[in-house]
Amino acid sequence: MGKEKFSRSKPHVNVGTIGHVDHGKTTLTAAITSVLAAKFGGTAKAYDQIDAAPEEKARGITINTAHVEYETANRHYAHVDCPGHADYVKNMITGAAQMDGAILVVSAADGPMPQTREHILLARQVGVPYIIVFLNKCDMVDDAELLELVEMEVRELLDKYEFPGDTTPIIHGSAKLAMEGDKGPMGEQAIMKLADALDSYIPLPERAIDGAFLMPVEDVFSISGRGTVVTGRVERGIIKVGEEIEIVGIHDTQKTTCTGVEMFRKLLDQGQAGDNVGILLRGTKREDVQRGQVLCKPGSIKPHTHFTGEIYVLSKDEGGRHTPFFNNYRPQFYFRTTDVTGAIELPEGKEMVMPGDNVSIIVKLINPIAMEEGLRFAIREGGKTVGAGVVAKVIA
C-alpha cells in the first residue's frame, strides 16, 4: 500500500479511541474514516483493516496499535485504536501514541463498565488532557430516560477522575448505522457532530519548538582551547548563542552560558526542537556535566526524587520478570539517557505486583532527575527492561 502524502496545510492533532471491550471503539474508528473521507477526502478504512493492528515496539515493549488518519474542514488527525485492553494500558503508559485528546466510547446499552473506568483513570494518570464521549449503540436504546441516566453516570465518572464532567461533549449515535451509510441523526450526522467536537473542544497542542528549551545530555567532550561541548537532541524549544542555560539533575543545578551551537560540524546561531546538536558551554568543566542531566531554560524544570507513577510490568513472555515483586523493590529507573536507582512503594493493601500487571506506585530515587508530570521512564534490572512507566504527580 503506497504512503499518501502527508498534508501539512492543516494543523495536526493526535487522538485515539478508549473505552470498554466491545463498546464499539474500532467500529467508530472505521465510521469516522468513512464519513470524513467522503466529505473531506482521505482514505476510508474497513473494520478488519483497523482490527488487524500491526505490532510495534516502544521502550522494549511490543504493542498492537492501529493508526488511521482523517481530515475535518480545519484539521488533520492521526488516530490510534488498540485491539486489546492490555495494548491500551501499554500504549498509554509508554506514550507510544501520545494523545492530545481521547474519544471515550461507551455503549448506551451497557453504560460504563470496568475498563471504561480504568481507561479514564489511565488518561488522568498519563496526562491525556481532553476527553470527548461518544455514546454508542443509541439505536438499541428506545428509552430516552435510560440514555439520560447513562450520560449522567459517564459525567460522574469523568468528574471522579478530575475531568470536567459537566462540560464534556457527549455525542449520541451509532457507529454501526454510520458505517451502513445511514444519513440520520444516529448515523452520519452523529459522526459529523463528533468531528465538530474534536475541532472545537480539543485545543491545538503546543508545538515542541514553542516550549521552554530542554535538551537531555547524551555525551560530553572537552575541546582544547574552546571548552566543554555537550551533545544531544533538542527535545523542545530553541537555544540561541549567548543565552543563559541551566544544567539540571543528579547534582546541584548549575548556571552556564551557551557560547556556540554546532550541527554536522557547522556553527549555527541556534538549535531547535528535533535538532541533534553540540552545545558549547562557557566556563563549565568536562566533569561538571554528565549523561542523564538536561540543559534547559533557567527555572523551567526542577530536579526531583519523589513522585507517583503509573507503571506497566512486562510479562514473562515479553521478556520481563518471571516472578512478582514486593514493596520496597529497588530497580533502576531509566529517564531519558540514564539509569537511577529508586525504591518502589506499593499502594495500600497491594502485596505484590505480578508480571503483566499495571499499578500506581510511589517512587523515591537516590539521585534527583529533571522531572515533570508526563515524563516517561523504563524500569530496568541490570540493563534489561522489566517495565515502563510515566510520572503522574511530582511529590518532592
From Swiss-Prot:
Region of interest: G4: 136-139
Region (G5) location: 174-176
Enzyme class name: hydrolase
GO molecular function, one term: GTPase activity
Ranges where the record places region G3: 81-84
Catalysed reactions listed for this entry: GTP + H2O = GDP + phosphate + H(+)
Binding positions (Mg(2+)): 26
Keyword GTP-binding on entry: yes
Signal peptide interval: none
Region (G2): 60-64
Chain sites annotated for binding GTP: 19-26, 81-85, 136-139
Main localization, broad class: cytoplasm
PROSITE patterns cross-referenced by the UniProt entry: G_TR_1 (PS00301), G_TR_2 (PS51722)
Residue ranges, annotated region (G1): 19-26
Function: GTP hydrolase that promotes the GTP-dependent binding of aminoacyl-tRNA to the A-site of ribosomes during protein biosynthesis.
Subunit and partners: Monomer.
Protein name in UniProt: Elongation factor Tu 2
Taxonomic classification: Bacteria, Pseudomonadati, Pseudomonadota, Betaproteobacteria, Burkholderiales
